[in-house]
Amino acid sequence: MREIISDGNELVAKAAIEVGCRFFGGYPITPSSDIMHAMSVALPKCGGHFIQMEDEISGISVSLGASMSGTKSMTASSGPGISLKVEQIGYSFMAEIPLVIADVMRSGPSTGMPTRVAQGDVNFLKHPIHGDFKAVALAPASLEEAYTETVRAFNLAEMLMTPVFLLMDETVGHMYGKVQIPNLEEVQKMTINRKEFVGDKKDYKPYGVAQDEPAVLNPFFKGYRYHVSGLHHGPIGFPTEDAKIGGDLIDRLFHKIESKQDIINENEEMDLEDAEIVIIAYGSVSLAVKEALKDYNKESKQKVGFFRPKTLWPSPAKRLKEIGDKYEKILVIELNKGQYLEEIERAMQRKVHFLGQANGRTISPKQIIAKLKEL
């Protein structure tokens, strides 16, 4: 392990470089701009390319173009910028172009409070586009995870050939401190790169794969010809209105993610064995939860356990159902008006308790303890 001092946004950039990202296209927006700035410094030093575009739409567009050339690529923004990127997010999903999209969440809606924290993009990124969509979204909760979840985001994007969201709230992005991260050799060993077709060019059908597998898009300029389209398409990418081909395509885009959910989903569980109450939280809120439980579990007769999904989408619905069936008192805590609460209650098929706020401020351990005493 290496010990460094950094903030969350710069750790995202460091992880991206070390896992092989060599292109960043974007447009500055608070509170994600530090990622962009760090990439502008680091990429030229390692043979990569950085470009600040005229707006958020062109920022994601050039990143997709770079990815189609075979280069690991990313962009970063916050809620208002992500709203502008949604057309190309849909294109990335449909054409199976891998891309990491960092969303450092700030208070909204609209322009909201640019320098304040929120978790208001959670439901938005579950389904940001028109048409059907299967999201992959990771939620770092610490400086260490700002690094490790970025590595995981790139690996999942390359493995699944799909856009992957790094859904990080402002507090994690701007917290600063000493952190231990994996050695570069460890990162290189765990790095996943997209598959390439090796064979006769006339046999190359990038979208002609099994129903639980992603497309195999060879990088441009290697002599393999295919068509890239946001339209429904057949095995070599040319548009079609055939009902079976179109239906099979959408089924495959879903199933390639659903079939890998055991790999995609990661959770943290604490003190669930004898718990009478279970708290569910994610992102920076989990830090306040852990601080609150240090004292509460020593003083209270009611033991409190903690469940944290690191992967928000696809949701850990099966595990949530198990928790809902086993524990009577469940408290969901979020920096919004109950966005992930909706998914938790859907998975558990029951109502649970909630503590949330959308005022640009963090939830304190004192607020959490006060809520626990009400249950």
Where on the chain are the PLM-derived regions?
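Glycine-/acidic-rich phosphate or pyrophosphate-binding loops and their flanking alpha/beta elements
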Residues: D7-L11, I257-I277, K290
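Generic long, charged, amphipathic alpha-helical segments
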Residues: S286-E322
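Conserved thiamine diphosphate
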Residues: R116-E170, R194-K195
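Peripheral docking tails and interdomain loops at the edges
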Residues: E328, E334-L375
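Conformationally flexible catalytic loops at phosphate/diphosphate-handling active centers
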Residues: V164-E268
